């Protein structure tokens, strides 16, 4: 299985990206293609692994317009990585760089699965019982009801195909569980979800993201991105608070010793580096977007996520699921 990795994208590129790619090769045996500046790769790569390199002299900067950058920088590392998937030289692409540029490159080079108007970024987050798929987390800040319907279908298929959930429960993120609560968007979407080909349990609130009540939570990218980053911020704040309390005096330090192992496990469960990256669902190929602050561990796990999507034929499964909806006339006029 060949995974193309954009080594120039991310806050800690290229060193941490290369380290993560090499770790994935050593641990799981992936065939990784390093895409980026050849001199930078030669400086940090382990020559003993002899990983193939694809030259990409250009880099999309974080302050650049995604569409403009992709058009003006055809030799950028993210564009080249996605092109390897299009050309069949790689089975998937991974990037921790500019999310918008990765999204644009994927749309321009790979195209959308037929019937998908808006691809969505899906993040796997921990809950009390296992994992929850949250989508969209930022690819689409404004969505029509039909877009959210497709998000629900794709998220359900991802949970079933990749995470192994037999019958994923899908919830619509709103401000109350009652069908009458929400904004114009959620009120319009609710009846569509009731007729959708997945197990819709109704509206869910923010607290249900981590409760395990549902396996998939659907929202637009504006709400999803805020929800995800709020969760990350809460975890960081709690971790700092615990450290501060423990450090106050020697009694606190001694009393905390029995709980260190437990706290370490809790931290691991909520550590974004454990989950790697977010697959871009709805494009005609496997593309995984990793966190901009990804270290080697996060990159390694993003490659694992990409490999799981390829192994389970996620793209084909989504195409089939969306095709069934189209044939049954469940699509909406507003997209």
From Swiss-Prot:
Principal EC category: transferase
Listed EC numbers: 2.3.1.274
Subunit structure and binding partners: Homodimer. Probably interacts with PlsY.
Molecular functions per Gene Ontology: phosphate:acyl-[acyl carrier protein] acyltransferase activity
Protein name: Phosphate acyltransferase
Organism: Desulforudis audaxviator (strain MP104C)
Example GO BP: phospholipid biosynthetic process
GO cellular component: cytoplasm
Record localization: Cytoplasm
Primary site of residence: cytoplasm
Listed SUPFAM superfamilies: Isocitrate/Isopropylmalate dehydrogenase-like (SSF53659)
Pathway(s) annotated for this protein in UniProt: Lipid metabolism; phospholipid metabolism
Tree of life domain: Bacteria
């Amino acid at each position: 299985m060949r995974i193309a990795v954009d080594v120039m994208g991310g806050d800690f590129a290229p060193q941490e990206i290369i380290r993560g790619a090499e770790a994935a090769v050593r641990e799981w045996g992936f065939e990784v293609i390093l895409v980026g500046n050849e001199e930078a790769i030669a400086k940090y790569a382990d020559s003993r692994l002899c990983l193939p390199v694809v030259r990409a002299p250009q880099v999309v900067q974080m302050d650049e317009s995604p569409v403009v950058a992709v058009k003006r920088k055809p030799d950028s590392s993210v564009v080249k990585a996605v092109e390897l998937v299009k050309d069949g030289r790689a089975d998937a692409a991974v990037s921790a760089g500019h999310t918008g540029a990765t999204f644009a490159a994927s749309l321009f080079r790979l195209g959308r699965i037929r019937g998908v108007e808006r691809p969505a970024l899906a993040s796997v987050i921990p809950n009390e019982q296992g994992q929850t798929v949250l989508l969209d987390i930022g690819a689409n800040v404004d969505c029509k009801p039909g877009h959210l319907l497709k998000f629900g279908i794709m998220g359900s298929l991802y949970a079933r195909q990749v995470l192994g959930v037999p019958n994923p429960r899908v919830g619509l993120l709103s401000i109350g569980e009652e069908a009458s609560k929400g904004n114009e968007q959620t009120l319009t979407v609710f009846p569509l979800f009731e007729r959708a080909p997945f197990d819709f349990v109704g509206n869910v609130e923010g607290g249900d993201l981590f409760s395990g009540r549902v396996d998939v939570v659907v929202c637009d990218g504006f709400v999803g991105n805020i929800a995800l980053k709020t969760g990350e911020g809460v975890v960081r704040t709690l971790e700092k608070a615990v450290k501060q309390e423990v450090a106050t005096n020697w009694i606190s330090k001694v009393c905390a010793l029995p709980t260190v192992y437990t706290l370490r496990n809790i931290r691991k469960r909520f550590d974004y580096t454990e989950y790697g990256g977010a697959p871009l669902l709805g494009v005609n190929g496997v593309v995984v977007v990793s966190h901009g602050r990804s270290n080697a561990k996060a990159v390694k796990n993003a490659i694992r996520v990409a490999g799981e999507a390829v192994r389970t034929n996620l793209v084909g499964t989504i195409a089939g699921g969306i095709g069934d909806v189209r044939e049954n006339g469940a699509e909406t006029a507003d997209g």
